Amino acid sequence: MVSLEKNDRVMLARQLPLKSVALILAGGRGTRLKDLTNKRAKPAVHFGGKFRIIDFALSNCLNSGIRRIGVITQYQSHTLVQHIQRGWSLFSEEMNEFVDLLPAQQRMKGENWYRGTADAVTQNLDIIRRYKAEYVVILAGDHIYKQDYSRMLIDHVEKGARCTVACMPVPIKEATAFGVMAVDESDKIIDFVEKPANPPAMPGDASKALASMGIYVFDADYLYELLAADDKDDASSHDFGKDIIPKITREGMAYAHPFPLSCVQSDPQAEPYWRDVGTLEAYWKANLDLASVTPELDMYDQNWPIRTHMESLPPAKFVQDRSGSHGMTLNSLVSGGCIISGSVVVQSVLFPRVRINSFCNIDSAVLLPEVWVGRSCRLRRCVIDRACIIPEGMVIGENAEEDARRFYRSEEGIVLVTREMLRKLQVKQER
């Protein structure tokens, strides 16, 4: 354990990111989001009115001072690659800054694609070694949060760790979806179980468990050794949570980093914000929260901007139709290029170029880019996928049986509508 003075911390906050490379694991399909990820990887899914999910990890890197980034892709990567090429070409090659796209290419012997999260890094080691980084920051590309990775790097150095795992308390009922750990008084991880059926509770709070966030800092040389050994282990599933972290824990080399120490938030008293948005309900709820009066995630913090690909779009427009009805919104996010004509939009998120025609009522809905809503529609508690054309007079979110028959309806009552579902519905109606 190294004790650092304030001046040392300030200096390290500048130096450590320059000695680091971030690897963003962005190849996941996100099957729990159902048809929303049929044609795009989960990190490429739209979020928050104008962003993609991966923009949060990329923005955290940029704001933390990490300007050497590798994005590891696999499933349905075209949309993701296109987004990064268009929106993240701001780095200077002359200053050794970059975002490298690392698609699965079966570089190593055999015909395997990425077998797990650790294998995704292993198969790119020939490229990663060329970065000559002292530290490797492993990130998931499908979470919504704001974090200063330089603070986590300082914690890693101060504790003398070879591996540091970001963690936060989660409700015990939700902990089955995470790696769960136990730590001692120095934050050394003394036990780690990936997605346990019966998660162990935190000492002093039986309602919560200490969960891994899938954010890791490694000494680079130590990581390379671990991955080389793991690649030769036929019994391994080649996954950080299932194999690598438990092994390091047994060797006494892993330390925990409490997320509140590096979480970036405008209100110091607020609960640290981190969302998986892995289910349709979580995705819908996290989007709508941004439209509330006091959202849990501050998207307006100029000191920690979330960047994305910016299209040249006209301002949103609210117009009065010929009948005299006004286009109105309440507690909603409305992006550029949207037109609301003689309709009411309440507690909803409208992505760019959404068109809502007259006499519609939109309530608690997430409308992705280029959605067109015909006249006299009522949409409630739903997610409408990109470029869907909602026919005139359609009602969604009011009749559970009808919604389940026509579209996908979650157990919580959130309705997902895609172009393919609408096409099939039209074919049925024409028969």
Curated annotation (Swiss-Prot):
AMP binds at R40, H46, R52, R130, E370, R386. One of its GO terms (molecular function) is ATP binding. SUPFAM superfamilies: Nucleotide-diphospho-sugar transferases (SSF53448), Trimeric LpxA-like enzymes (SSF51161). The keyword Nucleotide-binding applies. Alpha-D-glucose 1-phosphate binds at Y114, G179, E194, K195, S212. Involved in the biosynthesis of ADP-glucose, a building block required for the elongation reactions to produce glycogen. Catalyzes the reaction between ATP and alpha-D-glucose 1-phosphate (G1P) to produce pyrophosphate and ADP-Glc. PANTHER family: GLUCOSE-1-PHOSPHATE ADENYLYLTRANSFERASE, GLUCOSE-1-PHOSPHATE ADENYLYLTRANSFERASE-RELATED. This is Glucose-1-phosphate adenylyltransferase. It comes from Salmonella paratyphi B (strain ATCC BAA-1250 / SPB7). The gene is glgC.
